[in-house]
Amino acid sequence: MKLRSVLLAGLFGASTAASGQMLSPDGYGKIRFGQQLGAVERQLGQRAAPRTADPACSMVTFKRYPDVRFMVENGVITRADANRIVRNSAGITARMSVKEAQRHRPALLVGPHKYDENGQYLTLAQGTDKALIFEASKGKLQRMRAGLKPAVEYVETCG
């Protein structure tokens, strides 16, 4: 019985820790945009994967943060991408429609999607150099990214 309790506590603790992270224009978890990749690896005690193939621009992941990929440009983490709506500083959830997100955050700027004729980008700028961007299709939020400009504004990723 004790072993079962320990296993359940471990599972729920890990789940809570992972879901407790928040994506913002400043960073994700312990990672801050603008940090050197090497410094982040030392801070987290783990290496990014895969090893950066192109020093100019690569996408990497950390085991600690399985829901997010990080853009590294010239050794600096500039952006994070999530293939779903994760907990974020805007308080926007996956259950919200585009219209609900706009009501929740009136400062969201809505623009057309580059590839999806039924899609939109919803951008919440933070100052002149950072942003949180949501992608939507047919009125439903699909994925998101955050980071430093201009990297966060790139439609495509790298690597």
Question: Model regions: which residues?
Answer:
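Short, solvent-exposed mixed-charge patches
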Residues: T157-G159
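A cross-family detector of function-defining hotspots
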Residues: G20-Q21, Q35-V76, A94-L141, A146-A151
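Bacterial N-terminal signal peptides that target proteins for export
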Residues: M1-L7
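Second-shell loop/turn segments in exported
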Residues: P25-K30, I85-I92
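N-terminal signal peptide c-region/cleavage motif recognized by signal peptidases
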Residues: A14-A17
